[in-house]
């Protein structure tokens, strides 16, 4: 599983499967073995997965797309967050992870997904700066959840006092215009799996 976990960083087509396999490794079952064999057969039949970057004129925008499956795990009731980061029209990062806390509402789960996506976007901007590319625009974070956008655009917790305090940094980044949160239709959200 360690090898497919390493491979899953570069192969967005197996990201969700790798997440599920990693979750099963603390207590593997026969079903876990079937999953890893199925993944092995898939990788044998699809040995090459290539992200082809065509030339684009002036790719100066970082866009983060996020989506969350609220309480998707029937055992733990934890939500799954997924996302895509694009530089211009090129996809440069994808992920699918279980959230560490149990969300009490779908808006809260989507907010936690936006926090994850925003941290990835800001990390990519910092990497670009280290490579000598200054990026002074706001990072656009797109989601299909109005409630999560409302939480991100306010200051403080308001009526959602149960949100983890360490997740509220997103509000200050929105206020300082480092991030711009926009709503996208659920059918057009490319992070929706």
Residue ranges: model-predicted function:
Residues 1-51, 185, 192-193:
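C-terminal reverse transcriptase regions that engage the nucleic-acid substrate
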Residues 4, 61-107:
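RNase H-like nuclease fold core
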Residues 10, 28-31, 57-58, 77, ...:
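Secondary-structure capping and boundary motifs in well-ordered enzyme cores
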Residues 16-17, 73-75, 94-95, 151, ...:
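Short helix/loop capping segments that flank catalytic or ligand/cofactor-binding pockets
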Residues 24, 61, 97-193:
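RNase H-like nuclease module associated with reverse transcription
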Residues 32, 44, 78, 117-120, ...:
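Active-site-proximal structural scaffolding
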Residues 41-68, 133-135:
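Structured nucleic-acid-interacting core domains from mobile-element enzymes and related host factors
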Residues 45-49, 91-94, 123-130:
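Conserved helix-loop functional segments at active or binding sites
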């Amino acid at each position: 599983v360690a090898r497919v976990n390493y491979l899953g960083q570069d192969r967005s087509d197996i990201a969700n499967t790798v997440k599920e396999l990693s979750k099963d490794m603390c207590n593997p079952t026969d079903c876990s073995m079937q999953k890893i064999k199925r993944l092995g057969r898939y990788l044998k039949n699809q040995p090459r997965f290539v992200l082809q970057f065509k030339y684009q004129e002036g790719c100066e925008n970082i866009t983060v797309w996020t989506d969350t499956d609220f309480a998707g795990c029937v055992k733990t009731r934890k939500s799954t967050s997924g996302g895509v980061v694009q530089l211009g029209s090129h996809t440069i990062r994808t992920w699918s992870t279980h959230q560490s806390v149990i969300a009490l509402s779908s808006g809260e789960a989507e907010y936690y997904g936006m926090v994850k996506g925003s941290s990835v976007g800001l990390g990519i901007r910092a990497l670009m700066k280290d490579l000598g590319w200054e990026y002074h625009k706001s990072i656009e974070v797109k989601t299909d959840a109005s409630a999560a956008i409302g939480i991100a655009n306010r200051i403080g917790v308001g009526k959602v006092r149960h949100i983890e305090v360490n997740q509220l940094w997103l509000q200050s980044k929105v206020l300082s215009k480092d991030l711009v949160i926009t709503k996208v239709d659920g059918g057009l959200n490319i992070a929706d799996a």
